[in-house]
From Swiss-Prot:
Signal peptide: none
Transmembrane segments: none
Subunit structure: Binds ribosomal protein uS19.
Species: Mycolicibacterium smegmatis (strain ATCC 700084 / mc(2)155)
Listed GO CC annotations: cytoplasm; ribosome
Entry domain remark: The PRC barrel domain binds ribosomal protein uS19.
Name used for this protein in its record: Ribosome maturation factor RimM
Main location group: cytoplasm
Entry keyword set: Chaperone, Cytoplasm, Ribosome biogenesis, rRNA processing
Lineage of the species this protein comes from: Bacteria, Bacillati, Actinomycetota, Actinomycetes, Mycobacteriales
Compartment list: Cytoplasm
GO BP, one annotated term: ribosomal small subunit biogenesis
GO function terms (MF aspect): ribosome binding
Length: 173
């Protein structure tokens, strides 16, 4: 299974750098100079890219890739996602930490065992992580902050997330 670790947002400057939105908790290792990443463009075939240089830029990364020498080449990469195979990921020892792909697809229920839906996606925002839950009824999207005050437990074994939603949270959609 593939896991997205970054996405090209746009070109930066005229020398071929791209702005990359980080989707990994280990960008120093994933985007280190010399690292090779698989890239999947919005259209076209996957290919490998070698990182030549990287620097921080306002919560994102400015990345120079081998073979991308100008703005036109960088513009062609807009929307490209960088991928790793989940089998290559190190195991997580902390029972309270999760990879996004582990949470996606899990069943969400309230502390009273009332069904809410399934996690469709984990959103990474400036305010923290949010679970985008597709509701069982009507298929609407419910956004649940992934914080201890709301998410009371996560069971990998049962593929279930238990939430204690504040009043009105499940009505917002």
């Amino acid at each position: 299974m593939d896991l997205v670790v970054g996405r090209v947002v746009k070109a930066h400057g005229i020398s071929g750098e791209v702005v990359v939105e980080i989707r990994t908790d280990d960008p120093e290792a994933r985007f280190a100079p010399g690292a090779v990443l698989r890239g999947r463009p919005r259209s076209g075939a996957e290919r490998e890219y070698t990182i030549e240089s990287v620097r921080a830029h306002g919560g994102r990364l400015l990345v120079r890739l081998a073979g991308v020498a100008d703005r036109n080449g960088a513009d062609e990469l807009r929307g490209t996602v960088f991928l790793v195979d989940t089998a290559e990921l190190p195991a997580i020892d902390d029972p309270d930490e999760f990879y996004d792909h582990e949470l996606e697809g899990m069943r969400v229920v309230t502390v009273d065992d009332a069904p809410v839906g399934k996690v469709a996606e984990v959103l990474h925002t400036a305010g923290g992580e949010i679970l985008a839950v597709k509701a069982d009824e009507g298929g609407r999207e419910i956004l649940v902050p992934f914080v201890g005050a709301i998410v009371t437990s996560v069971s990998r074994q049962n593929a279930t997330i238990v939430i204690d939603p504040p009043e009105g949270l499940l009505d917002l959609a």
